[in-house]
From Swiss-Prot:
The keyword Zinc does not apply. Residues 21-38 have a biased composition (Low complexity). Its main location: membrane. It comes from Aspergillus fumigatus (strain CBS 144.89 / FGSC A1163 / CEA10). GO terms for biological process: proteolysis. This is Probable dipeptidyl-aminopeptidase B. PANTHER family: DIPEPTIDYL PEPTIDASE 10, ISOFORM B, PROTEASE FAMILY S9B,C DIPEPTIDYL-PEPTIDASE IV-RELATED.
Length: 919
C-alpha cells in the first residue's frame, strides 16, 4: 500500500503504499482547468483493449423509466375491450386513466430533458475557463461528445510518455541515451548523443548495440522483454519469458549479448533454463551478480562458470532480493543488492523470514504457483502461503552483508547503537567512495532514524546521525531511496565527501547537505512553507548545483528548481508564472534532462540543455497530438480548484463540474478520495479518469479533498493522524461535504463517496462517522476494515504496534454497524486473491453486519483477482458496477428496495380500481 505520494498507487486502485507524487492548487476558488489524476498506478498497465461495445447506448442505459412502463400497453388494451361491453362509464374511466398516464409520462419526459445531461462543453472552452473570474466557473453552448467508460479503461485518455535511459559514455561522456525500437538500419537498440538529434552535427553518430529485436541462441529465438547495456556499452543483458511475482518483482531467463558479434549466451551457461530473480552489471562491466532461488551468484564474463556467493537461501532466507513486505512497503522495487562504485564489493540484504507467520491466498481458477496438481486433486484451489507480518507479529530479520569480490568472501560489520534484530528496518543503502557506505535504518515503528557509516576496507562502522522524529513533531520516517552522495573535490570547494538528504525542517520536508560523511549537523539548502519531492533529482558536481522538484508555488503543483550547494541562488527551471506539474530526469553529468510537463494542459516532453544560466530546449520528443484532438472533440468536465479551511487547516479541493454546468440546477455529488498518509489526489496533472467520466457522461459533480494526513501541506497537518487513522481524515471529508451540501447547485439528498484500498477504508470510515447525516451512499473497493489485518511495516509506521496503541486500533476499526445502517445503501467489492489487503477485511466486516442485522449493502467478489482486480475481465466489471450502482443510487432505486414487500401486478390493481368505481 505504499503511497506517500508521488509514486505507486495513483489510480482509483491505490495500492496502499503508494507512493509519492504531487502538484499545486491556486489560492482562490476561481481557478478552473482540465487537469486530473491518472487512472492507472505506475506499475499498472492500462486494460489491454477497449472492452468492445455496449449492449445499450449511454442514453438508453441511463434513461429514466418509470417502473412497469414497458408493460402497460397490453393489459390496458385488454381492459379497454372488456369495458366497451360494460357501458360508457367504464370507457370514461378508461380514457381518464389513459390521459393521466399520458400526462405523467409527458411530465417525466420534460423533467428528464431539463434535469438530465446538458449540452456538452468542448475541451477548448474548458481550457479558456482556466482564468475565469467567476467562482462558478464558465459554461459553453458548444457541443462535444461525452467521455466514455470504455475510453477510460482502455487507456485512450492516457498521455504518452517516453522513458529515456540516460547512460554515461565509456569515457564519462554526458548526454548519451539508450533508445529502443526502429528498423534494422537504425538498429533495435542504440545509443544516441542528444546533440545529434537536431541533425546538425553528423560527427556524433548513433552506436548500434542490437541490430534486431530477436536473438537466436542454439536455434532458439529469444525475444527480450527488457534490456540493460553494460557501462562500457560492449555487452547487453537481456531478459526473456518474464513472469510477474508481486508488485515489483519478477523472474525470467537472462542472456548476455555481445555487441561486436551480435550473439548471445545464457547468463549461466550451466543452467540456461534457470529462472533468475535479479541481475545487475558490475560498474566495471566485467561481471554480473544475480539471484536465483534466493541465492546470490557471480558470473565473471571471462569465464562460463558462476560463483555461488551464498548457498543457504531458500524458502525462509532471501539474499539480494526483498521479501513481500520489504518489496511492498520499504524498497518499492525488486533489488536489495548494491555494487560499490569501484566494483570491489557487493552489499546485499540477508532476509530471514523463519519467524514470520504465513497467510494463505487461494486461487480458484489460475495456478500462479506453477505446480501441477496430482491426479484427483485438480478441483482443489491453488494456495500460495505468503510470509506476511501483520501488526504485532514477528517481522523479517534483515541484516546488511558484504561480499569481497577479489577475496570471494562474505562478511558483516557490527555497529554499536544498532537497533535490535526485531526492531530494525533498513530503508536505504548508499555507497560513497573508498569502500565506505551509508546505511539509513529506523526502528520498527519508524519514528527514530539512525544513519551509520561503514568502512568495508577496515570492516568497522559507527553511528553518525540520529533523529527522534516522534519527539520532534509526533511524526514518522517515510522510507525513501533518494539520498545523494557528493564526493570531495577541493578544486570546487568540497574538501570532504558528503551527502544530501531530506529532513524535517520547521514543519516541512527540506534538503540538507551533510559533509563530512560523519557530520551530524546539516547545511540547509532549502527552507520555507513548502516541501521538496523525492529530492534531490540530481547534483551537478562541476558547478555545485543541486536540482530538485518542489511545491514552492502551491501544494498541488510541481516545478523544477536548482540551488547552489551552499544554499544560495535558488531558482526555478520551469515557468512558475502559471500552474504546472513537472517531472524531470537528468543525464549522467546533469548537462541535459528530459523535462516532462504533466499538466494542467496537454502533457509534453522535451530534452533541455542545463549548461547555461538559462535552459534551452534541444528537442521536443512528445506533444501528445492525438490527445489534443480528443480534447477538442470531447466534452470534458470543468475543474475548479479551491481551498477549504477545516479546524484551522487549509485543505486542497478540486470540483469537477459537468460540461455546460448550470448553477440554477441541483446536481448529485460524488466524493472521491484516497487519503493515505503522505498521499496526494488533488494535483494539477492532466487526467481523464473515472471521475471525469462520471462528470462528463453521467452529469454528476465530483469533489475530491485532500484532508489531514495527506502530503505536501506541512508536517503538522500530516502527522496529526498518527495513532488514530481515519478519524481526522473522515472528519475533513464530512466537513467539506457539508459545505457542498449547502451550495445552491447541489442536491444534498444525493451525495455519495467512494475510494479504493486506503480510499475504501476511508469510504467506510466516513460513512461510519457520518451515520447518514451527510452522505447517503458509499462505494468501497478492496478496503481495510481493521488495521490489525494489514501488514506490519506500513501499519505500525502510522499506528504504532497494537501492543503500544490498542485503543487506537480499536478506534480505527470499522465497528459501528448501527451507524452504517443509517446510510441508504453502500457497496463493497474485493478481489478474492488480494495478497495486499486480504479478503479477510471484507469477510470480517460482513460478519459484523450479519450479527447486527444490517442489510443495506451490496457485496461483490472477484475470483483470482489481486489488489488491482484485473483477472478475467474483472477490472472492466468493477468500473461498470461502480457506474451502474451509482446511477441507481442517484436515481433513487435503493430507496425502493430498502424494505421490499410483495406487489400485485398493475393489471390486478386496475381491476380492483374499476371495481371500486363501479356503482
Amino acid at each position: 500500500m505504499r503511497r506517500s505520494d508521488g509514486h505507486e498507487e495513483t489510480s482509483e486502485f491505490l495500492p496502499m503504499t503508494h507512493s509519492r507524487s504531487v502538484s499545486a492548487a491556486s489560492q482562490t476558488s476561481t481557478d478552473s482547468s482540465l487537469s486530473t489524476e491518472s487512472l492507472f498506478p505506475r506499475e499498472q498497465k492500462p486494460f489491454p483493449n477497449a472492452m468492445g461495445g455496449m449492449a445499450l447506448a449511454d442514453d438508453d442505459k441511463y434513461r429514466d423509466l418509470e417502473d412497469g412502463e414497458a408493460e402497460l400497453s397490453e393489459p390496458f388494451l385488454s381492459s379497454s375491450k372488456k369495458a366497451a361491453t360494460g357501458g360508457g362509464r367504464a370507457r370514461r374511466i378508461f380514457w381518464i386513466l389513459v390521459l393521466l398516464c399520458l400526462g405523467g409520462w409527458l411530465l417525466a419526459f420534460v423533467l428528464f430533458l431539463t434535469g438530465g445531461r446538458a449540452n456538452y462543453q468542448t475541451a477548448s472552452d474548458a481550457l479558456q475557463a482556466h482564468g475565469a473570474d467567476s467562482a462558478l466557473g464558465s459554461t459553453s453552448t458548444s457541443s462535444g461528445k461525452p467521455v466514455t467508460l470504455q475510453q477510460v479503461l482502455g487507456g485512450q485518455w492516457n498521455p504518452r510518455y517516453h522513458a529515456i535511459g540516460w547512460v554515461a559514455g565509456p569515457n564519462n561522456e554526458d548526454g548519451l541515451l539508450v533508445e529502443k525500437g526502429g528498423d534494422e538500419k537504425q538498429g533495435y537498440l542504440r545509443v544516441d548523443d542528444i546533440r545529434s538529434r537536431k541533425g546538425n552535427n553528423t560527427g556524433r553518430e548513433s552506436r548500434v548495440l542490437m541490430r534486431k529485436p530477436i536473438v537466436h541462441v542454439d536455434g532458439q529465438a529469444i525475444v527480450p522483454s527488457n534490456v540493460w547495456p553494460s557501462p562500457d556499452l560492449k555487452k547487453v543483458l537481456l531478459i526473456s519469458e518474464q513472469q510477474k511475482n508481486w508488485r515489483h518483482s519478477f523472474t525470467g531467463k537472462y542472456w548476455v549479448f555481445d555487441v561486436d558479434s551480435q550473439t548471445a549466451q545464457p547468463l549461466d551457461p550451466s543452467a540456461p533454463d534457470g529462472r533468475v530473480q535479479l541481475a545487475l552489471w558490475s560498474p566495471a562491466s566485467d561481471a554480473v551478480v544475480f539471484v536465483r532461488d534466493n541465492n546470490l551468484y557471480l558470473r565473471r564474463l571471462s569465464s562460463d562458470s558462476v560463483v555461488a556467493i551464498t548457498k543457504d537461501g531458500g524458502e525462509n532466507l532471501f539474499y539480494g532480493v526483498p521479501d513481500w513486505v520489504y518489496e511492498e512497503e520499504v524498497i518499492s522495487g525488486n533489488s536489495v543488492t548494491w555494487w560499490s562504485n569501484d566494483a570491489k564489493y557487493i552489499a546485499f540484504f540477508r532476509t530471514n523470514e523463519t519467524s514470520v507467520p504465513e497467510f494463505p491466498v487461494q486461487y480458484y481458477i489460475s495456478r500462479p504457483s506453477g505446480k501441477k496438481p496430482l491426479p484427483g486433486l485438480e478441483n482443489y484451489p491453488d494456495v500460495r502461503e505468503i510470509k506476511y507480518p501483520k501488526p504485532g507479529a514477528p517481522n523479517p530479520v534483515v541484516d546488511l552483508q558484504f561480499y569481497d569480490v577479489e577475496k570471494n568472501e562474505v562478511f558483516s560489520v557490527q555497529v554499536a547503537d544498532d537497533f535490535a534484530d526485531d526492531d530494525r528496518i533498513i530503508i536505504e543503502v548508499l555507497w560513497a567512495s573508498e569502500g565506505k557506505i551509508l546505511v539509513r535504518s529506523t526502528n520498527r515503528e519508524s519514528d527514530i532514524l539512525k544513519v551509520y557509516l561503514i568502512d568495508t576496507q577496515s570492516r568497522t562502522g559507527k553511528l553518525v546521525r540520529s533523529e527522534d522524529v516522534a519527539g520532534l513533531d509526533g511524526g514518522w520516517v517515510e522510507p525513501s531511496q533518494s539520498t545523494r552522495f557528493v564526493p570531495a573535490d577541493p578544486n570546487n570547494g568540497r574538501p570532504h565527501d558528503g551527502y544530501i538528504d531530506t529532513v524535517p525542517y520547521n514543519g516541512y520536508d527540506h534538503l540538507a547537505y551533510f559533509s563530512p560523511l560523519d557530520n551530524p549537523n546539516a547545511l540547509m539548502l532549502t527552507s520555507g512553507e513548502w516541501e521538496v519531492v523525492d529530492a534531490p533529482a540530481a547534483v551537478d558536481l562541476q558547478r555545485g548545483l543541486v536540482y530538485f522538484v518542489g511545491t514552492k508555488e502551491a501544494p498541488t503543483q510541481r516545478h523544477v528548481y536548482r540551488v547552489q550547494l551552499d544554499g544560495s541562488n535558488l531558482n526555478p527551471l520551469t515557468d512558475t508564472s502559471k500552474p504546472g506539474y513537472y517531472d524531470v530526469s537528468f543525464s549522467h553529468g546533469t548537462g541535459y534532462a528530459l523535462l516532462t510537463y504533466k499538466g494542467p494542459s496537454i502533457p509534453w516532453q522535451a530534452i533541455i540543455n542545463t549548461h547555461g544560466d538559462e535552459i534551452t530546449y534541444e528537442d521536443r520528443i512528445e506533444d501528445n497530438a492525438q490527445l489534443t484532438k480528443m480534447v477538442e472533440a470531447y466534452a470534458l468536465p470543468t475543474e475548479v480548484y479551491q481551498n477549504v479551511t477545516v479546524d484551522g487547516y487549509t485543505l486542497q479541493v478540486v470540483e469537477r463540474r459537468p460540461p455546460h454546468f448550470n448553477p440554477a440546477k441541483k446536481y448529485p455529488v460524488l466524493f472521491y478520495l484516497y487519503g493515505g498518509p503522505g498521499s496526494q489526489t488533488v494535483d494539477r496533472k492532466f487526467t481523464v479518469d473515472f471521475q471525469s467520466y462520471v462528470a462528463s457522461s453521467l452529469g454528476y459533480i465530483v469533489v475530491t479533498v485532500d484532508g489531514r494526513g495527506t502530503g505536501f501541506i506541512g508536517r503538522k497537518a500530516r502527522c496529526i493522524v498518527r495513532g488514530n487513522l481515519g478519524f481526522y481524515e473522515a472528519h475533513d471529508q464530512i466537513a467539506t461535504a457539508k459545505m457542498w451540501a449547502a451550495k445552491s447547485y447541489v442536491d444534498e439528498t444525493r451525495m455519495a463517496i467512494w475510494g479504493w484500498s486506503f480510499g475504501g477504508f476511508m469510504t467506510l470510515k466516513t460513512l461510519e462517522q457520518d451515520a447518514g447525516r451527510t452522505f447517503q451512499y458509499g462505494m468501497a473497493v478492496a478496503p481495510v476494515t481493521d488495521w490489525r489485518f494489514y501488514d506490519s511495516i506500513y501499519t505500525e509506521r502510522y499506528m504504532h504496534t497494537p501492543q503500544h496503541n490498542p485503543n487506537g486500533y480499536d478506534n480505527s476499526t470499522i465497528t459501528d454497524m448501527a451507524a452504517l445502517s443509517e446510510s441508504v445503501r453502500f457497496l463493497v467489492m474485493h478481489g478474492a486473491s488480494d495478497d495486499n489487503v486480504h479478503l479477510q477485511n471484507t469477510l470480517v466486516l460482513i460478519d459484523k453486519l450479519d450479527l447486527s442485522n444490517v442489510e443495506n449493502y451490496d457485496v461483490q467478489f472477484y475470483p483470482d483477482s489481486d489488489h488491482s482486480i484485473y483477472f478475467h475481465n474483472a477490472h472492466m466489471m468493477v468500473y461498470h458496477r461502480l457506474s451502474d450502482w451509482l446511477v441507481n443510487a442517484f436515481n433513487g432505486e435503493w430507496h425502493l428496495i430498502a424494505k421490499p414487500v410483495p406487489d400485485e401486478s398493475m393489471w390486478e390493481r386496475m381491476k380492483r380500481s374499476l371495481r371500486l368505481l363501479s356503482p
